């Protein structure tokens, strides 16, 4: 790409992305934080293990601030194009016994996975490196991709002037914009 993009990966990533956006003088589309990319990957991994289905069939995301205040918009979680509830019903009719997910426990798993890696290995730099490489590949490619990166909010979901992770279209031109997802009022 002909325009250099900045990726923020240092924690607290959302605050660091916000500060860099404000002080750098660069266009906002050139700045993004790793946000909840890893959290979303951990969510898909946990769902894959629980449902015993390949991760590539799972579309589920972690939104908000990376860390303890992140949340999972369950109304937007899908397995091969159907909601989780529809998936349970469908596989049950096939004779498969799939236990419904404890949503609070899954969120706790997502939030604590990084800490468990640090306790076991001393750091989480490998997973962050993979996320950075995926973003670099997207930016250097000729097509856009959707990721839960941290970038400035401009009225999406009624939120202004803060960097948070939501579905974001990213590509060779950097951050193209947020992809709105319907959520319940509770979410």
Model-derived regions, located:
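C-terminal substrate-binding/catalytic lobe of Rossmann-fold NAD(P)-dependent dehydrogenases
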Residues: 24-30, 40-185
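Short Gly/Thr/Asp-enriched flexible loops that form oxyanion-binding sites at enzyme active sites
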Residues: 16-24
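Gly/Ser/Thr-rich loops at beta-strand to alpha-helix junctions
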Residues: 8-16, 36-39
